[in-house]
Every structure is written in C-alpha cells, then in structure tokens.
C-alpha cells in the first residue's frame, strides 16, 4: 500500500472506502460500490479485515472486487522481467478461497465478485505476455473464471500503458492483447476463439471447452501450454465421434491454430 500512498496503511485504506462509498450513495443510491481490490498479497487477511470493517461500520457493499495474477516474483534482467507461472489449477485456489470467505458472512453471502484485473504477470515488461504460452495459459483461465465471478477484465487491451508511456519496441512484454501498432498477439486469438463459444456447453476439461450452437454446429477451443517450462513438444489429438444414427451427409471440420508458426508475430519480428 505505501507504494501508492505515502505513509498509507490498511486502516487508512478502509477509511478511504468508507468516505468514498458514503459520498457515492449520497449522490445516487443506484450507483454500485465495492472493494477492496485485493491483488494477491495477504489476500485472506485483507479480505477478512475489509469485510469486518464494512460490517462493523454498516457501510454499503454491493460487490466484492479483486485482481488475479498468476506469476511468481519476476527475475529482472535489463528492460525485462522474466517470470514463472503458477500451476493453472493452483492459481485458482486463491479465487476459491475469496468466494469461501465472502460467503462465510451472513451479510455478504452470495455477493457478486468482480475480477477487475487479471493476466499472467503483473508487470508490463514480461516477455511471456507476447508468447503462445501466454495464450494457452489464458485459455485455461477463461474456461473457469466464470464459475465464481460475475465479471473478469483482462489487463489490458493494448500495450500502450499509461504508467510507463509509449513502448520502446513493438514487442516488450506489455500487458496488451495487441502490440503497439495494433498487431494482434497470440492471446488476442484466445479471446477471438472463446467469443465463438455460445449456447450450450457440452464438454469441459483441463485442456478443452466445447459448445453446441442452435444451428447444430459445434465450436471448441483446445489448449496445450508447456507448464513445465522444458519446451518439449507435446502432441494434442482429438477425435470426433458421430452417433450411429447421425444423418449421412458431408461435414466440415474447420481448424484454426495459434502456435510458434501460426498467429505468432513475435517470431516474425525476431526472424
């Protein structure tokens, strides 16, 4: 907290919420207020203390907010921060704990939780952001974030980040889905693919999500991140089984791929 406000502490932050929430509601009761925007540092203690404060002071709380980043402390070398990511399943344990804490309060049980920022790394100069690995890892996140959260906002759409100014090079590990110059990075296509997943979910696993549309067509996303960091090639196979009574006619299986050779502008830039 002192990184944002001089001599700030937890109680001062809660007091800031108190005066802000009251001011907002005085203007219009219909405006929603919430917090505390925890961000992966001592989350349990922060969230419990915040809810205790709101309960004791009888403050308005329409929703709970938090951030979600899944990297360890970066190894800073030159302009960049190189990071390792948590195991995808382990990364969700903190989110599930937040839901559990909120629901443990009678006053707040069932409150909406909004993830107002999420990404792999929390720094705007992590090379992982520009990679296919990031795209595959985020696909796993997208497949599950909606289970316990009302909304979740990827941080950020573009690489021009106001805190650090205009990027010094097209690919510098920025947060964005698109690099400077509106170049779509691999993770951009993760969102483009997930946009197609509508109507009825018929399958979800640790590496895939399949939906059936009203017109009878199927859309799916399959991801294959190299979570062990060894860079070894891992094959992905899938099989489509048609029922015996399926109408005999022509069918089309359209596949779009993002990997080191496809949809990867970073490699083109390096080459």
Where are these regions (language model features)?
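Conserved residues at the C-terminal ends of beta-strands
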Residues: 1, 67, 152-155
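Flexible loop/turn segments at secondary-structure boundaries
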Residues: 2, 41-43, 71-74, 120-124, ...
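Noncatalytic carbohydrate-binding groove/subsite architecture in carbohydrate-active enzymes
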Residues: 9-150, 170
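Alpha-helix capping/termination and helix-coil
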Residues: 102, 106, 149, 195-202, ...
């Amino acid at each position: 907290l002192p990184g944002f406000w001089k001599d700030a502490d937890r109680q001062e932050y809660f007091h800031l919420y108190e005066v802000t929430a009251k001011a907002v509601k005085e203007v219009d009761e219909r405006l929603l207020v919430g917090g505390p925007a925890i961000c992966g540092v001592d989350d349990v203690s922060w969230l419990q203390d915040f809810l205790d404060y709101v309960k004791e002071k009888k403050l308005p709380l329409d929703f709970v907010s938090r951030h979600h980043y899944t990297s360890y402390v970066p190894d800073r070398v030159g302009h960049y921060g190189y990071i390792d990511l948590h195991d995808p399943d382990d990364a969700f344990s903190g989110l599930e704990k937040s839901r559990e804490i909120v629901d443990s309060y009678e006053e707040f049980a069932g409150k909406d939780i909004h993830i107002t920022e999420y990404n792999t790394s929390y720094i705007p100069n992590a090379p992982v952001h520009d990679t296919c690995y990031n795209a595959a890892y985020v696909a796993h996140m997208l497949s599950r974030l909606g289970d316990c959260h009302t909304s979740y906002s990827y941080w950020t759409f573009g690489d021009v980040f106001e805190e650090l100014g205009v990027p010094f090079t097209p690919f510098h590990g920025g947060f964005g889905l698109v690099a400077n110059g509106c170049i779509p990075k691999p993770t951009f296509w993760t969102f483009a693919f997930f946009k197609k997943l509508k109507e009825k979910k018929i399958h979800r696993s640790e590496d895939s999500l399949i939906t059936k549309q009203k017109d009878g067509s199927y859309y799916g996303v399959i991801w294959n991140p190299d979570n062990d960091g060894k860079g070894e090639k891992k094959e992905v196979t899938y099989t489509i089984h048609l029922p015996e009574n399926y109408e005999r006619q022509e069918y089309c299986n359209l596949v779009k791929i993002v990997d080191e050779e496809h949809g990867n502008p970073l490699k083109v830039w390096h080459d």
